[in-house]
Swiss-Prot record:
Compartment(s) where it occurs, according to its Swiss-Prot or TrEMBL record: Cytoplasm; Cytoplasm, Cytoskeleton
Predominant cellular place of this UniProt entry's protein: cytoplasm
Record family assignment: Belongs to the TBCE family.
Gene Ontology CC terms: cytoplasm; microtubule
Bilayer-spanning residue ranges: none
Domain CAP-Gly: 27-71
BP term (GO), one: tubulin complex assembly
Gene: TBCE
Organism: Homo sapiens
Domain LRRCT intervals: 342-384
Keywords for this protein: Acetylation, Chaperone, Cytoplasm, Cytoskeleton, Disease variant, Dwarfism, Intellectual disability, Leucine-rich repeat, Neurodegeneration, Phosphoprotein, Repeat
Associated clinical condition: Hypoparathyroidism-retardation-dysmorphism syndrome: An autosomal recessive multisystem disorder characterized by hypoparathyroidism, intrauterine and postnatal growth retardation, psychomotor retardation, epilepsy, microcephaly, and facial dysmorphism.
Protein name: Tubulin-specific chaperone E
Length: 527
């Protein structure tokens, strides 16, 4: 085995037949002669053992089948950053042009060159590069010092995800030469991060840093971003992060923080990042979050936490209590929320009901699940909410005369916006509360006539359809019934309460309830 292998090979990232691994051992493995590398695979199913052979432990793996012994000549140790860029971005000239001889003068001496035009063209191509994508290109190091800065001075965005980089120091050696670097993605590199302090200003103009699936800890995050004084977006998906301390002098400029798929995070840890002054977007999808409380704010008050938070994403979690959304009403700047695939929101038949309840619970919300909340939808949601819980309000001490209101604390806690809705729309009348409550009718059936204005020979039908049924599903039903492609169908409706007015059902994702379709209305079908 060569001296190079023994000197610096341990800890290096390597690629073998498309699979990535980390070198854990270099040496002889008796009784077979010659040098071997012991590697731990990223995919443990690729290995054969745990680093042992015939009773001798040569290295240790996290998984019992995560290790293998491989000959050094079978392993790809990767390439340097600049070579990878040239391989990917430099256009090769034809063979004849490459061989063209030229005489150039350097100083006072004439020098014969071959392919001088080609070299100049390569340098021109590289110097113009601003965005570089080197995903899965086996980049393992920076290469010759100063080479990147000289060849590619204008790079602003680099994707180095899924390469063979083994340490944050190596990332810095690359980034240090890119003085205009604003976006850096090193996801899916198993990086060793520094344990000591990091020099500030290393990534002085960096705005976006992506560290998904790198194995970084929260303490390491805080050390690394100390070198990014202007950082605006930080992505930390799938790192098993536990937020262990409050950021004090770092992350103060961050506007977007993605903590998706970090299953160790809970609401107590979120308090540690709750005072980041510029944080506008927080992504907590697939973290297992089920509850959130802002104890500093009482009923009807705003919290001092997350002062700038405008957009919260909590998809794929365990949210099962409506109190979660009551707490979000306390966030002073919240305008957009995404909460798909949670126990409270994932049932198709209840999706419209859940949407209306969330809208009624969070007064300042403008967008829910990437769908704009129009004024008429908010009005309907709030009126339905006021009506649905009207009897409960009365039983809890509610009264049309505000001076006679004696609402229980339990009701105010469960419905913190109800009093405001009574002020906005008036208290519910007794006659309103005698009818069936719309929000409680999960499967309310509407009896509708179905007519075909352009097909006069078609018989008028009468169908019972759930009010929560989406326009898309209504079209699917009619498509099967009429043997007409869904894409050809245009739907509208008319109501005896609105004579002479036809209302288009143009959004396939909305329900019949959304368009205020009621019993006795008539669907108009055209194709």
């Amino acid at each position: 085995m060569s001296d190079t292998l023994t000197a610096d090979v341990i800890g290096r990232r390597v690629e073998v037949n498309g699979e990535h691994a980390t070198v854990r051992f270099a040496g002889v493995v008796p009784p077979v002669a010659g040098p071997w590398l012991g590697v731990e695979w990223d995919n443990p199913e690729r290995g054969k053992h745990d680093g042992s052979h015939e009773g001798t432990v040569y290295f240790k793996c996290r998984h019992p089948t995560g290790g293998s012994f491989i000959r050094p000549n079978k392993v790809n140790f990767g390439t340097d950053f600049l070579t990878a860029i040239k391989n990917r971005y430099v256009l090769e000239d034809g063979p004849e042009e490459d061989r063209k001889e030229q005489i150039v003068t350097i100083g006072n001496k004439p020098v014969e060159t071959i392919g001088f035009d080609s070299i100049m063209k390569q340098q021109s191509q590289l110097s113009k590069l601003q965005e570089v994508s080197l995903r899965n290109c086996a980049v393992s190091c920076a290469g010759e010092k100063g080479g990147v800065a000289e060849a590619c001075p204008n790079i602003r965005k680099v994707d180095l995800s899924k390469n063979l980089l083994s340490s944050w120091d190596e990332v810095i050696h690359i980034a240090d030469q890119l003085r205009h670097l604003e976006v850096l993605n090193v996801s899916e590199n198993k990086l060793k991060f520094p344990s000591g302090s990091v020099l500030t200003g290393t990534l002085s103009v960096l705005k976006v840093l992506v560290l998904n699936q790198t194995g970084i800890t929260w303490a390491e995050v805080l050390r690394c971003v100390a070198g990014c004084p202007g950082l605006e977006e930080l992505y930390l998906e799938s790192n098993n992060i536990f937020i262990s301390e409050r950021p004090t002098d770092v992350l103060q400029t961050v506007k977007l923080l993605d903590l998706s798929s970090n299953q160790l995070i809970d609401e107590n840890q979120l308090y540690l990042i709750a005072h980041l002054p510029r944080l506008e977007q927080l992504i907590l999808s697939d973290t297992g979050i089920s509850s959130l409380h802002f104890p500093d704010a009482g009923i009807g008050c705003k919290t001092s936490m997350f002062p700038s938070l405008k957009y919260l994403v909590v998809n794929d979690n365990q949210i099962s209590q409506w109190s979660f959304f009551n707490e979000l009403e306390k966030l002073p700047s919240l305008r957009a929320l995404s909460c798909l695939r949670n126990p409270l929101t994932k049932e198709d038949k209840e999706a419209e009901t859940a949407r209306l309840l969330i809208i009624a619970s969070i007064g300042q919300l403008k967008t829910l699940n990437k769908c704009e909340i129009l004024p008429e939808e908010r009005r309907r949601a709030e009126l339905d909410y006021r009506k649905a819980f009207g009897n409960e309000w009365k039983q809890a001490g509610g009264h049309k005369d505000p001076e006679k209101n004696r609402l229980s604390e339990e009701f105010l806690t469960a419905h913190p916006r109800y009093q405001f809705l009574c002020l906005k729309y008036g208290a519910p009348e007794d006659w309103e509360l005698k009818t069936q409550q719309p929000l409680m009718l999960k499967n309310q059936l509407l009896t509708l006539k179905i007519k075909y204005p352009h097909q006069l020979d078609q018989k008028v039908l009468e169908k019972q359809l759930p009010g929560s049924m989406t326009i898309q599903k209504v079209k699917g039903l009619l498509s099967r019934l009429l043997k007409v492609p869904v894409s050809d169908l245009l739907l509208s409706y008319e109501s005896p309460k609105k004579p002479g007015r036809e209302i288009e059902l143009e959004n396939d994702l909305k329900s019949l309830q959304f368009y205020s379709v009621e019993n006795g209305d008539c669907l108009l079908v055209r194709w």
